[in-house]
A protein has these predicted regions:
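Feature activates predominantly on carbohydrate-active enzymes
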Residues: 23-24, 28, 32, 36-43, ...
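Substrate-binding cleft/loops of secretory-pathway carbohydrate-active enzymes
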Residues: 299-327, 373-379, 407-413
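Disordered inhibitory propeptide/activation segment of secreted metzincin zinc metalloprotease zymogens
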Residues: 11-24
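Acidic, His- and aromatic-enriched active-site or binding-groove loops in soluble protein domains
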Residues: 265-279, 313-332, 420-425
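Structured mid-domain segments that build the active-site/substrate or prosthetic-cofactor binding neighborhood
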Residues: 218-225, 233, 337-445
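Active-site-proximal loop/turn and secondary-structure-junction residues that shape catalytic pockets
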Residues: 250-252, 299-303, 322-324, 365-367, ...
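Catalytic domains of carbohydrate-active enzymes that cleave complex glycans
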Residues: 420-594
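Short, well-ordered secondary-structure micro-motifs within conserved domains or adaptor modules
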Residues: 57-84
């Protein structure tokens, strides 16, 4: 669980950290510090100077103690002894006399505590790797002596796999992302959770089959011995990486169908039976040499259903993938057809949680077929993350558009996911506040219209369902109260266009120069939507003159769509496909075909 503890002290007073660009405070951290502790102290000094204009000296704890200190991390000061309960990532922020204490581990806790202090008590916001808000005080920065906050994360592993957090370790620290996949997390920010070798679909390499689409027979002794040999080799080559994935091939029809494998499938009631037994055996065989290594696998598509007899080894992570779910609504609603052979995702989740000590979730948070189309899943993210926490999940990997800017609301989605991964129990009001703060800063004066647009896309898709692979958003979003779906689509487009027009007008020439571009970039998804509305209209019209008019509208919309993508540097319109802006596409075709 996450524990957030507030302790009220009766007679409060203020700690005046800076006044008129001067300070009496020094920042203190451990002499025998880690890189992360040093980063924490230096980052605090840097941001406090930006906020107040005052220079905060930074010293180690072998210096003489002073009355006015900001203590960062566990060190040689009263009340600053290490607390095991905080783990690697937890922290306590409190006041003791005239001292401000930001206490946390030498791994990441002290650093995370610093960024939380800057957010909660100084008004900083870390929205993306390129955009943050750092307020300035005209004269005095003070904090209430009643401060006493402890936070310990629910999830030991947190990874938001979106472009706005990629390839920048500092935004990872600011958003408390510790998953190393896609993020260059070094000792500077306390390191992270890194996998040894591949992150997923690793069995073809480990078993040396050379076949990425077909699963090898896991009852074959040669396959086992080859895999065991390669697991040992990888662990010896990179002994600092303590997790290695032994996971199935991608796709939905890769399992072996030999008699031995089929017998295990029937005995276990699941196709993951052979895989769990295979990995359990490897764990036992490497236990003496690598006692602290954790083996990892996927429960994905045909292996999603848990086995009925064999439990995963205590030293195993199972990453359960919610690939088949409807993402418009909370996953627990189960608003799609369920194959009785595999069961529903919530059912699988609860059963896995009973037999697996370290259960992770692979969470899909974009439309991989059309990454710049409207994807109204923002209202489902919070209940989904709470479901994972309630069910005992200890790690979440939220996969999105990781390779490029998102022509929709990807930057907002990534920010919200990071907040939820740290605190999956936040209430609706807090969640809405995070959304509002992001929009009002990232989109500037246009943010109020983007917020109305967000509400509208969710209202207009309330009765629809969507998976992670769909190309036609016009099938999902339509304004209610019109004679037919298509008429409602045109009405939605007109209203949404009006909101974006106002947002652009409010941000053109604004001091926040990036706001206009951010509004324009998010508008790409509306152009994408309109393309499918026009396509549907063309299919419904019988009159050739009307069809010709629609064809001209399609060409004009596609031309504007392409210009906007080039202007905002959005190259990837679907997974594994990037546009070449030096070549002008055929505007009579759909963007998915460019």
């Amino acid at each position: 669980m996450m524990y957030i503890i507030y302790i009220t002290i009766t007679e409060a007073h203020m700690l005046y950290l800076a006044d008129d660009k001067k300070t009496n405070y020094v920042i203190v951290y451990r002499k025998d510090h880690t890189d992360s502790e040093k980063t924490a102290a230096e980052e605090l000094a840097t941001y406090l100077e930006k906020i107040t204009g005052a220079n905060f000296p930074v010293v180690t704890d072998d210096a003489s103690a002073e009355k006015h200190e900001i203590v960062v991390g566990f060190c040689d000061r009263p009340g600053c002894k290490a607390q095991k309960k905080l783990g690697d990532d937890g922290y306590t922020i409190k006041v003791s006399g005239e001292r401000l204490l930001i206490l946390g581990s030498a791994v990441r806790g002290a650093l995370y505590g610093v960024y939380t202090f800057l957010e909660k008590y100084c008004g900083c916001r870390f929205f993306t790797k390129d955009f943050e808000k750092v307020p300035t005080v005209e004269r005095t920065l003070y904090v209430d002596s009643n401060i006493d906050l402890t936070e310990i994360p629910v999830f030991e592993y947190r990874n938001v796999y979106w472009y706005s957090f990629m390839n920048d370790e500092m935004i990872c620290a600011k958003q408390k992302i510790n998953g190393g996949m896609g993020h260059p997390i070094t000792d500077k920010i306390g390191g992270g959770v890194h996998y040894n070798g591949g992150f997923c679909h690793t069995i073809p390499e480990l078993a040396e089959t050379g076949n990425i689409w077909d699963m090898p027979c896991l009852m074959d002794e040669d396959i086992y011995q080859t895999t065991l040999k390669n697991v040992r080799a990888k662990l010896r080559a990179e002994p600092d990486k303590k997790i290695i994935s032994i996971s199935q091939v991608d796709g939905n029809n890769g399992e072996c169908s030999c008699d031995k494998c089929r017998a295990v499938f029937e005995e276990e009631g699941s196709h993951i039976g052979t895989l769990i037994r295979f990995i359990n055996r490897i764990k036992e065989d490497i236990r003496d040499e690598f006692p602290d290594v954790v083996l990892d696998t996927l429960a994905y598509q045909y292996t999603r259903k848990p086995p009925e007899k064999t439990k995963p080894h205590d030293g195993m992570i199972v990453r359960l993938c919610n690939v088949e779910s409807c993402f418009r609504h909370p996953i627990e609603n189960v608003c799609h057809e369920v194959d009785p052979a595999f069961g529903s995702f919530p059912e699988n989740l609860r059963k896995w949680s009973k037999i697996c000590k370290r259960l992770y979730i692979w969470d899909y948070t974009t439309n991989f077929t059309n990454m710049s189309t409207i994807f109204p899943n923002l209202m489902a993210l919070r209940p989904n993350m709470k479901l994972y926490a309630d069910t005992g999940v200890v790690g979440v990997f939220s996969q999105g558009n990781s390779t490029d800017f998102n022509g929709e609301l990807g930057e907002l989605r990534a920010y919200l996911l990071a907040k939820l991964q740290w605190n999956p129990y936040m209430g609706e009001a807090e969640y809405r506040l995070h959304m509002q703060e992001f929009c009002e800063n990232y989109y500037g004066e246009g943010g109020k219209y983007i917020l109305r647009y967000i509400d509208m896309i969710h209202d207009c898709s309330e009765d629809s369902h969507m998976n992670m692979y769909f190309d036609n958003s016009a099938n999902i979003i339509s304004m209610k109260g019109y004679k037919d779906h298509l008429t409602g689509c045109f009405a939605f487009y007109d209203k949404a266009s009006e909101l974006f027009d106002k947002a652009e007008a409010e941000t053109w020439g604004a001091k926040n120069k990036s706001a206009y571009t951010n509004v324009r970039r998010s508008r790409i998804s509306l152009h994408n939507y309109y393309n499918f509305v026009l396509k549907s209209a063309k299919e419904n019209f019988e009159n050739e003159e009307d069809k010709l008019m629609i064809e001209r509208a399609i060409v004009e919309n596609n031309r504007e769509h392409f210009i906007l993508m080039r202007e905002c540097d959005v190259k990837e319109n679907r997974e594994f496909h990037r546009l070449d802006f030096s070549e002008v596409p055929d505007f009579t075709t759909y963007p998915m075909q460019w």
